[in-house]
């Protein structure tokens, strides 16, 4: 509350209303987006993984993998669009998805996944349970924040 006085020495109490277009949470999110240029750390990314089947023959396995990923507390979706593999990889890379999970015959036969990280063009094959254990640990927020 502000106080002001008149020429007759009367004291008036004034109130000021403050209104901001964005609150502190919105400003914080804006700073995060600007700082990371959309490439969020894995633990804070809104969509952490996209599972991409190589063809329609592997869609069931891709759905199974995505469900297991979600059960481990990692956000995931399956890309079932009717596009070729390179288009899907490019599309999700531009969307800055941290991990792309590729599923094909080799992965189905060995109960594994092929991982492609956003910051690398290299692909890594991992057994599914090892993948879940490793990335569940990465999904926890750092304790030094």
Regions found by a protein language model. Name each.
Residues 96:
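A short alpha->beta transition loop at the rim of the catalytic pocket in nucleotide-sugar-dependent
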Residues 15-32:
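Conserved phosphate/anionic-ligand binding catalytic regions in large, soluble enzymes, centered on
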Residues 123-145:
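C-terminal interaction segment
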Residues 36-90:
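Generic long, charged, amphipathic alpha-helical segments
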Residues 93:
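Cofactor-cradling patches in redox/metallo enzymes
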Residues 1-8, 12:
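Single conserved hydrophobic/aromatic residue that forms the stacking wall/gate
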Residues 107-123:
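Amphipathic beta-strand/beta-sheet edge segments enriched in Tyr/Trp
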